C-alpha cells in the first residue's frame, strides 16, 4: 500500500465503526487522494465533527497539515492542546528529545515508524506537536511515519479496552456491550440503507433493543431475548425479524 493509503488506514483505525466513520473515510480519501482542497475548511470540518475525540481530531488535523504545510496560516488550538496536554514533564522531555535528535536524522516513513514504536504514547504526542509547530524541519514521510506509529498504539489500547469489556465477568457489562453494538449497527443501517425493507428492519431493531433495555437483565427471559436479537443482527441478509417478533 502507498504512503497515503497506510496513513488513511491508521487514522481510520482510531475511530468507532458507524456512519461518521464512513463519512470521515470519504473525506480522507479525497484529501490524501491528490484532490485540491482548502486546508482551513478541512480543519474546521474536523474540529466540528462530534463523533471524534479531542485526540482523534488533533491527530487527523495534524496529518492534513502535514500534507500542505505551506498553506498553514496559523496554529490550531484543537491540535496543539491535546498533543501537549498529555503526560508528565519527563515524558514531554522524551518527546522533545525524540523530535529534535532522532527524527531530524530520519529520511523515510518506515524508519520514523520503527523509531517511534519504541516510545510511549505521551512522548509521541509531544513529539508530534514539535513537528506540527516546526513543519519545515521534517519531511512529510517522517511526520506521517511518527503519526502512524502513534495511531497503532492508540488503536491497540482501544481494542484491549473493548475486548476487556466484552469479556467482563459482570453480566450487565457484557449485555450492554451487545446492546450498544446492536444499536450502532441498527442506526448505521437506518442512516445509510437505501431500501425500505432495510430501513424498516433497522427501525424494528432499534425499537426492540429499547424494549430489551426496559425489561432489564433481571427478567427471567431477558438474556435469552437479547441473544436472539443479536442473532438477528448476525444474519447475512439482515432480513429475518421473525425471531424477534416471536418474543416481542
Curated annotation (Swiss-Prot):
Per UniProt, what is the name of the gene that codes for the protein in this document? Answer: M
- Ranges for the region named RNP-binding are 165-248
Please give the name of this protein.
Matrix protein 1
Membrane topology annotation? Peripheral membrane protein
Q: Where is this region: Membrane-binding?
A: 1-164
Q: What else is known?
A: B/Memphis/12/97 is an avirulent strain in mice. Influenza B virus genome RNA segment 7 encodes the M1 and BM2 (AC Q80DN6) proteins. Normal translation produces the M1 protein. The M1 termination codon overlaps the BM2 initiation codon in an overlapping stop-start pentanucleotide 5'-UAAUG-3'. Termination of M1 translation triggers reinitiation on the BM2 AUG in the +2 open reading frame.
Key words of the record: Host nucleus, Membrane, RNA-binding, Viral matrix protein, Virion
Origin species, per record, is Influenza B virus (strain B/Memphis/12/1997)
Asked if Signal is a keyword of the record, the answer is no
Amino acid at each position: 500500500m502507498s504512503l497515503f493509503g497506510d496513513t488513511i488506514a491508521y487514522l481510520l483505525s482510531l475511530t468507532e465503526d458507524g456512519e461518521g466513520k464512513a463519512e470521515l473515510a470519504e473525506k480522507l480519501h479525497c484529501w490524501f487522494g491528490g484532490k485540491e482542497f482548502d486546508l482551513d475548511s478541512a480543519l474546521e470540518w474536523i474540529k466540528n465533527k462530534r463523533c471524534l475525540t479531542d485526540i482523534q481530531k488533533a491527530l487527523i488535523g495534524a496529518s492534513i497539515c502535514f500534507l500542505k504545510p505551506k498553506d498553514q496560516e496559523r496554529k490550531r488550538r484543537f491540535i496543539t492542546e491535546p498533543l501537549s496536554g498529555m503526560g508528565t514533564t519527563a515524558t514531554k522531555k522524551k518527546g522533545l528529545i525524540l523530535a529534535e535528535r532522532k527524527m531530524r536524522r530520519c529520511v523515510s516513513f518506515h524508519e520514523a515508524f520503527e523509531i517511534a514504536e519504541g516510545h510511549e504514547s505521551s512522548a509521541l504526542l509531544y513529539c508530534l506537536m514539535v513537528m506540527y509547530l516546526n513543519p519545515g524541519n521534517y519531511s512529510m514521510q517522517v511526520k506521517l511515519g511518527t503519526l502512524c506509529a502513534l495511531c497503532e498504539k492508540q488503536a491497540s489500547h482501544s481494542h484491549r479496552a473493548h475486548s476487556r469489556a466484552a469479556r467482563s465477568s459482570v453480566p450487565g457489562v457484557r449485555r450492554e456491550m451487545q446492546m450498544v453494538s446492536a444499536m450502532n449497527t441498527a442506526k448505521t443501517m437506518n442512516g445509510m440503507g437505501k431500501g425500505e425493507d432495510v430501513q424498516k428492519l433497522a427501525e424494528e431493531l432499534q425499537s426492540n433493543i429499547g424494549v430489551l433495555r426496559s425489561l432489564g437483565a433481571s427478567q427471567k427471559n431477558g438474556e435469552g431475548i437479547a441473544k436472539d436479537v443479536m442473532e438477528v443482527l448476525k444474519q447475512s441478509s439482515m432480513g429475518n425479524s421473525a425471531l424477534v417478533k416471536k418474543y416481542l
